[in-house]
């Protein structure tokens, strides 16, 4: 469950290292984001000489959460960190690589490009 003011790691090579969620995309009073949801975030840490700079406003999709996520088949999945992938307006990732495991629910949310770049899909 990601809410405003939550810090997230970045799971791609776009140049950002840490993000802070400032808005959950959806209905006007939506409080939390889960795996596969889009957020608006600000870059808190960035790698030098990369396209994404510190204090830049970006869109990102949640790929891992510490909070348990219950699947339809009854199994529960949770990760060690909160992580997101920076995307553009069309929903394609800005980076060319994705690090760490990715949840299978992203395929159902039509983020197939992120799933294809991921080294492991759980």
From Swiss-Prot:
Q: What does this protein do?
A: Binds to 23S rRNA.
Organism of this sequence: Marchantia polymorpha (Common liverwort)
Write down a Pfam family by its short name.
Answer: Ribosomal_L14
Q: Name one GO cellular component term.
A: chloroplast
Q: Note the subunit structure.
A: Part of the 50S ribosomal subunit.
Ribonucleoprotein as a keyword of this entry, yes or no, is: yes
Q: Where is the protein localized?
A: Plastid, Chloroplast
Task: Give the UniProt keywords, A-Z.
Answer: Chloroplast, Plastid, Ribonucleoprotein, Ribosomal protein, RNA-binding, rRNA-binding
InterPro entries linked? Ribosomal_uL14 (IPR000218), Ribosomal_uL14_bac-type (IPR005745), Ribosomal_uL14_CS (IPR019972), Ribosomal_uL14_sf (IPR036853)
**Protein's name according to its UniProt entry:** Large ribosomal subunit protein uL14c
Signal sequence residues: none
GO BP terms: namely: translation
One GO molecular function term of this record is: rRNA binding
Q: Which NCBIfam families match?
A: rplN_bact
- Report which superkingdom the organism of origin falls in: Eukaryota
Which family would the database say this protein is a member of? Answer: Belongs to the universal ribosomal protein uL14 family.
Q: Key word ATP-binding present in the record?
A: no
Main location group: plastid
């Amino acid at each position: 469950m990601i809410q405003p003011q939550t810090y997230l790691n970045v799971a791609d090579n776009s140049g950002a290292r840490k993000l802070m969620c400032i808005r959950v995309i959806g209905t006007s009073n939506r409080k939390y984001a889960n795996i596969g949801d889009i957020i608006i975030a600000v870059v808190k840490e960035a790698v030098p000489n990369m396209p994404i700079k510190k204090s830049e406003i970006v869109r990102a999709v949640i790929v891992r959460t510490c909070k348990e996520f219950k699947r339809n088949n009854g199994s529960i999945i949770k990760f060690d960190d909160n992580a997101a992938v920076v995307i553009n307006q069309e929903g394609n990732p800005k980076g060319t690589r994705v690090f760490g495991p990715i949840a299978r629910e992203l395929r159902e949310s039509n983020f197939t490009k992120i799933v294809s770049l991921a080294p492991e899909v759980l």
